[in-house]
Amino acid sequence: VEFEGMNQMVVPTLIDYLFKKVLRPSIVWPAFVYNYPKTMQPLARQNDENPTIVEQFQLVVNGWEIIKAYSELVDPMIQKANFDAQAKAREMWDEEATSGDDDFVLAMEYAMPPQSGFGMWIERTFSLLTGQENLRDVVLFPLMKSVKKDEPQS
């Protein structure tokens, strides 16, 4: 697979792009995707048996990410190293890389309990349940365009 801009991407961005544009659209039936490379999720906890992957999964249905969940990384030393790696990747033109957060790392140094979380796309779930192909047809609270004061309202 080749595409424009491929040679300028750093490895995590390339993996993410290939997953989203090549693999994920081919997943029709519900599937859990897990064993993500550590470089893909700097805020997730490393797997105890294999430190090259993180404790994360996604539920993918009909090519859409419905749920994303992971165990949170709570080790401040590892998190600082991850933020440093992200900063270096950002310098190498990786637009997806996050900048470090020293306040977050400082808070972690005071101790954080083990934790995890998940995000669920309600609109995508409604689209699947109602057979809609366009997310705009099921958005619960669509953004409204601002009306300028000098424009007539209908």
Regions picked out by a protein language model, each given a short descriptive name:
Residues 72:
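Active-site environment of non-heme Fe oxygenases that use a 2-His-1-carboxylate facial triad
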